[in-house]
């Protein structure tokens, strides 16, 4: 199992087909764990797991955004240079996360660079998750007048 596509088979939670907010939450957690790693060998298992989750996020974004692709334009409208999706920035952030995770997984780099690479991955993953996780709605409180 040496391809990123086979990673998802290694993690039983992924077989439950979690939704995008759950996947994004796991990515945030894994990047927080990476921040505590201080040697390249420590990052390997976390990066493998993160890679599986990022692949699921990527495929989930692709699937969920398929309905939002722009397929026709008005005559005077300028067509987009690339695909125009509702969450295109989120998909780009996911791709950035996948790229930095790949560097952490396969590259040999100076030990001094580890905190910067994990920090970058953490920041982008949290930004991506912020796009996917909607904050809980505050409960509405109704104050009734006191009876005297």
Which positions does each model-derived feature cover?
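Sequence/structural signature of long amphipathic alpha-helices
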Residues: 1-148
């Amino acid at each position: 199992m040496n391809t990123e596509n086979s990673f998802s088979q290694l993690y039983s939670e992924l077989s439950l087909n979690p939704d995008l907010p759950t996947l994004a939450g796991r990515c945030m957690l894994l990047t927080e764990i990476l921040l505590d790693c201080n040697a390249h060998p420590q990052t390997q298992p976390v990066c493998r797991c993160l890679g599986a989750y990022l692949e699921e996020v990527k495929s989930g974004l692709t699937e969920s955004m398929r309905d939002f692709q722009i397929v026709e334009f008005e005559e005077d409208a300028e067509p987009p240079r690339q695909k125009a999706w509702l969450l295109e920035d989120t998909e780009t952030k996911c791709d950035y996360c996948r790229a930095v995770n790949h560097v952490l997984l396969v590259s040999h780099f100076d030990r001094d660079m580890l905190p910067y690479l994990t920090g970058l991955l953490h920041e982008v993953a949290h930004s991506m998750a912020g796009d996917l996780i909607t904050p809980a709605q505050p409960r509405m409180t109704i104050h009734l007048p006191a009876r005297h």
